[in-house]
């Protein structure tokens, strides 16, 4: 009696979906949870609770030290690319001058041969000698020519004869960009933001009993005293840096035209919406699926240690 098909499901000429999952081959998708989502009070670069937070006009929050190091690294990379681009332009100019010199020398040589030669280049005597000297496709001259052609042939399927592609360096952008949103960003466009910490009695007893760290801090809206969480939409004032919940900012700021904490004048353009933190729920977050393409064979052994989800 033949065995069931489920016991012989690995002898097909192609990979099935189950075999791809077990081997980790192809496009792998993973559902991200709450632990993989950045909270609202974390730096977008170091992913740790921010220290001296700075914000751009798109709402991305960074540590002051992290964003300064990022700008410094971008400046160094721009200088390196500019140097490489200028070196390439100089090399192209030298090659163009050399090509023009060779072309001019070739034209002068042809002009000299046409005007000062005693006999034409292709005479009947030379033509007859060349004709008599040819002994067919098996001659030594033809064989050596074919061997030389094979050696210099641009066969892309041979590693030794693969033509090298010229690497061109494009002119780089001279401005720094936001590491999170990739838009143009300068240091003067950043502004410091100030969160209001929760100084209630429970928080005070908690900080006295345990070592105080930035992980234990919780922040509140200075207007409604509601604890700020990842589910709330936050608004920062670029004029003074204070952070409010979106409800208070839309309710009081357009009417009073001043900050509710320091009474500093503010306008509608000073309201900057901060990027919300992640909760891990599909209704709140947009991108909760990680995707990666892997080139793995059956002999890698990773299929044995990779967890298979059902």
Curated annotation (Swiss-Prot):
Taxonomy, superkingdom: Eukaryota
Location of this chain's protein in the cell: Nucleus; Nucleus speckle
PROSITE patterns documented for this protein: ZF_RING_1 (PS00518), ZF_RING_2 (PS50089)
Pfam families attached to this UniProt entry: Rtf2, zf-NOSIP
Gene3D superfamilies to which the protein is assigned, alphabetical: Zinc/RING finger domain, C3HC4 (zinc finger)
Cellular-component GO terms for this entry: nuclear speck
Keywords: Coiled coil, Metal-binding, Nucleus, Repeat, Transferase, Ubl conjugation pathway, Zinc, Zinc-finger
GO terms under biological process: photomorphogenesis; protein destabilization; protein ubiquitination
SMART domains: RING
Record-given protein name: E3 ubiquitin-protein ligase CSU1
Organism of this sequence: Arabidopsis thaliana
């Amino acid at each position: 009696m033949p065995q069931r098909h489920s016991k012989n499901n690995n002898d097909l000429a192609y990979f099935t979906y189950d075999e791809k999952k077990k081997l980790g081959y192809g496009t792998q998708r993973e559902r991200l949870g709450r632990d993989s989502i950045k909270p609202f009070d974390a730096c977008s670069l170091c992913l740790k609770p921010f220290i001296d937070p700075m914000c751009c006009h798109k709402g991305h929050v960074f540590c002051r030290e992290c964003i300064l190091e990022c700008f410094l690294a971008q400046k160094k990379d721009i200088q390196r690319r500019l140097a490489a681009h200028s070196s390439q332009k100089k090399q192209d100019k030298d090659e163009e001058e050399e090509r023009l010199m060779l072309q001019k020398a070739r034209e002068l040589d042809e002009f000299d041969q046409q005007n000062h030669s005693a006999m034409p280049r292709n005479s009947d005597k030379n033509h007859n000698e060349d004709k008599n000297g040819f002994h067919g496709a098996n001659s030594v001259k033809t064989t050596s020519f074919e061997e030389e052609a094979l050696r210099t042939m641009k066969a892309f399927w041979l590693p030794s004869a693969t033509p090298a592609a010229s690497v061109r360096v494009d002119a780089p952008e001279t401005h720094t960009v936001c590491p999170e949103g990739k838009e143009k960003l300068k240091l003067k466009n950043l502004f410091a933001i100030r969160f209001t910490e929760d100084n209630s009695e429970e928080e005070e007893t908690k900080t006295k009993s345990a070592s105080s760290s930035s992980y234990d801090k919780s922040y509140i809206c200075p207007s409604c005293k509601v604890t700020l969480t990842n589910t709330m939409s936050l608004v920062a004032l670029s004029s003074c840096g204070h952070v409010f919940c979106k409800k208070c900012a839309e309710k009081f700021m357009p009417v009073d035209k001043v900050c509710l904490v320091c009474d500093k004048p503010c306008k509608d353009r000073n309201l900057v919406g901060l990027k919300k933190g992640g909760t891990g729920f599909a209704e709140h977050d947009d991108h909760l699926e990680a995707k990666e393409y892997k080139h793995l064979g059956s002999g890698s052994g990773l299929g044995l240690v990779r967890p298979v989800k059902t």
